[in-house]
Amino acid sequence: MSSYLFTSESVSEGHPDKIADQISDAVLDAILAQDKRARVACETMVKTGVAIVAGEVTTSAWIDLEALTRKVILDIGYNSSDVGFDGETCGVLNLIGKQSPDINQGVDRKNPEQQGAGDQGLMFGYATNETDSYMPAAIHLSHRLVEQQAKIRKKKNSALSWLRPDAKSQVTLRYEDGVATAIDAVVLSTQHDPGVKQKDLIEAVREEILKPVLPAKWLHKGTKFHINPTGKFVIGGPVGDCGLTGRKIIVDTYGGWARHGGGAFSGKDPSKVDRSAAYAARYVAKNVVAAGLADRCEVQVSYAIGVAEPTSISVTTFGTGKIADELIEKLIRKHFDLRPFGIIQMLDLIHPMYQQTASYGHFGRKPKDFTYTDGTGAQHSATSFSWEKTDRAEALRAAAKLK
């Protein structure tokens, strides 16, 4: 019997890097609401008393970038200098310029189907049947812990009103013969008001954050709990650490369980395959696993700048495939259009929804129907996390001739 440990981590929406991600995606959403043809590459840095928003944008839209940035910060919960950052009074510096015409000529085409990739690169998508979300268990639980921290913190008349926005989680699982069997260790660090006793904090976190999330069947006498192990976490957010867009790419994806092509997501419109192709690869892998073609599936795609067709598509099922990986690859090529325009159409990616993805993981979330208002004031229906649908699983299973 083989036995090993595996660890993943997550961070809350109040973590400095996640503040930056959310601002970048809020800018993208605001522009897409007015201009579906926009090209956006938005980067944000937050540090004590200031948010710097930079990047390259080509659009006919106008947005109030300062007001938008302040709203994101305030909605997270940074509304006072006492907390360490105040969206009302912080400086907002706008350093956004235009996208290079050299890139435009490589991406734009008269025939939309021949739209070229916005850059070269390689992207991975992954799925496993070890959780209902088709995500690796360690990252799934890590996300849910910090999500629960935010839920409790924002709850009206919360008994844990002393919680502050910045938080981190980490979960270590024990695997026996490739199957998760127990939680070996949990780390939960949460920012808090001064004056909170360590004993009270530990008890509250156990009852209100850990207990509702962690599966009881995986907890045992030997499970180690590290709750605010430094003993104090008052200074947090952008005061404690500088935050930058795109610095939490492993948190955003599979927690280190699957490979990563290196490209970040937030602030990038769907013409950037760093984002759209990673979403598509997840969609493909999840449908392969949901179809029962494999227990685990990793899909890699790659592109050349200005070229529509992927330069490669490869599939690995780690010995769990019910049919050969080569046959799964052929089915993928037949059932999924992985050209940039094909991905955008397949997943309906050109509308505001991206700020929703910027915290608690881009994958393993439930598709959500919502409405948004465009630049003319008209209302539109849309779906976020469309890449989490398993609507092609049945067709894949039938094509594979599995009973």
Curated annotation (Swiss-Prot):
CDD domains: S-AdoMet_synt
Cofactor binding description: Binds 2 divalent ions per subunit.
Enzyme class, UniProt record, top EC level: transferase
Gene Ontology biological process: one-carbon metabolic process; S-adenosylmethionine biosynthetic process
Annotated catalysed reactions: L-methionine + ATP + H2O = S-adenosyl-L-methionine + phosphate + diphosphate
Binding site for ATP: H15, D166, A167, K168, K232, F233, D241, R247, K248, A264, K268
InterPro entries: ADOMET_SYNTHASE_CS, S-AdoMet_synt_C, S-AdoMet_synt_central, S-AdoMet_synt_N, S-AdoMet_synthetase, S-AdoMet_synthetase_sfam
Annotated segments matching region Flexible loop: 99-109
EC number(s) recorded for this UniProt protein: 2.5.1.6
Protein name listed in UniProt: S-adenosylmethionine synthase
